[in-house]
Amino acid sequence: MIVIPAIDLKEGKCVRLEQGLMEKDTVFCDNPADQAREWERQGAELLHIVDLDGAFAGEPKNRASIEAIVKAIAIPTQLGGGIRDIPTIEAYLSLGIGRVILGTAAQRNPELVEEACRLFPGRIVVGIDAKNGMVAVQGWAEVTGVTAVDLAKRFEGYGVAAIIYTDIARDGMMQGPNIEATRALAEAISIPVIASGGVSSLKDIENLMAIETSGIAGAITGKAVYTGAINLAEAVALTKRGGA
């Protein structure tokens, strides 16, 4: 299991939202490329980037910042937010993004996931955001009637590289991830699961490591590494040595 720091982009800056609300944002850094370099310096093996403006608009919005991040670091990246079609996926992969995350598009158009996996094997990740176990889309603005487990099962056999599972009730609230829901999802599918939302202490990372055998491949942390609640270098060292 690896620890994956997040860079959430809004108007070209690194921000964190509370529970996905655009009006509840805190700016942590004006220069995303500098922030990416810092996470790489602290030992990150993968960087998670979200184009928040893109997620809400349904089309890419922070391309210049994303390009600057890719040029600034050597570690691989994964990017989500506003990616709804094959040309956008292709453009980002050509830019140097390692893996592209499909969220709302995956829920509304599973055929897109299937086609993208065929065209770009190993480079498509599905993001499933859920509130009380039900899938949320459109930048979390809309909760559907589909369960996270049922949606994830649809992608079995497509060749999806990973599923990022975010419990939006926990995201940005520093309350710890939803371990039980994450484990239930990981055990229901064969696709590796990356946990996200609420990872706010080394203890949370240890708790996720304890269910790693269920199929947990990583933990994304955002707010906690910006506020200092988690020291990224310490978290990376913890996962490398297999626990405390």
UniProtKB/Swiss-Prot annotation:
Q: Where in the cell is it found?
A: Cytoplasm
Keywords assigned: Amino-acid biosynthesis, Cytoplasm, Histidine biosynthesis, Isomerase
Listed GO biological process terms? L-histidine biosynthetic process
What pathway does the annotation place this protein in?
Amino-acid biosynthesis; L-histidine biosynthesis; L-histidine from 5-phospho-alpha-D-ribose 1-diphosphate: step 4/9
Residue spans crossing the bilayer? none
Give the domain of life. Answer: Bacteria
Checking InterPro entries in the record gives:
Aldolase_TIM (IPR013785), His_biosynth (IPR006062), HisA_bact_arch (IPR006063), Isoase_HisA-like (IPR044524), Isoase_HisA-like_bact (IPR023016), RibuloseP-bd_barrel (IPR011060)
Task: Provide the GO MF annotations for this entry.
Answer: 1-(5-phosphoribosyl)-5-[(5-phosphoribosylamino)methylideneamino]imidazole-4-carboxamide isomerase activity
Can you tell me which residues the record assigns to a coiled coil? none
Catalytic residues identified in the record: 8 (proton acceptor), 129 (proton donor)
What is the disulfide pattern of this chain? none
Q: What is this protein called?
A: 1-(5-phosphoribosyl)-5-[(5-phosphoribosylamino)methylideneamino] imidazole-4-carboxamide isomerase
Organism of derivation: Geobacter sulfurreducens (strain ATCC 51573 / DSM 12127 / PCA)
